[in-house]
């Protein structure tokens, strides 16, 4: 239901109405964590962490700290029972979305735009073959040496490369999803968006 509302512009997480790609279980960063949902436009990437009714918050701090290293903003999508707990957390930079029992979604708090990123995590999200192609580098060094050299690039350049990479990798799966889902998305449709395959993200 969240994906449907985003695609129907019922929930606006972007300043401008742009073409949005959505990925599910997208691997990222040095720790090779998986984002529940990633929303990508040509200018911005948003990570969505989902905490359903029976989920706990044990890993939430680590997940949030991982997201902020390369995503432009981060939201936590929660069920009604988690509202007070999520609002009591000391840091307020991430946004809060609440899905109610009657399947409505409320924007509880707008996420702040993140300004500082980790070059290491950005580079580790992209495979060497893509990095060499994008930056026109000969693939005659060890992967770690290539990434080390690329840390000399500006954050702006690396973020642009990452955005294009995400668009490429998520684009074909999202097209399949749009074709299959009909007017309303079902759980089976969401699995089409899954990027939880090493061969897909690291080729």
Residue ranges: model-predicted function:
Residues 104-178:
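A conserved mid-domain beta-alpha-beta active-site/ligand-binding segment of alpha/beta enzyme cores
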Residues 3-42:
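Active-site metal-binding core of divalent-cation-utilizing nuclease and nuclease-like domains
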Residues 37-39, 44-53:
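Conserved catalytic cores of phosphodiester-cleaving nucleases, focusing on short active-site segments
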Residues 41-43, 100-103:
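Short acidic-glycine loop/turn motifs at beta-strand connectors
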Residues 168-203:
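C-terminal non-catalytic accessory extensions
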Residues 55-98:
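Catalytic cores of nucleic-acid endonucleases
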Residues 24-27, 50-56:
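Short, flexible loop segments at the rims of nucleotide/cofactor-binding pockets, characterized by
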Residues 32-34, 43-45, 69-71, 91:
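Short connector loops at helix/strand junctions that flank enzyme active sites
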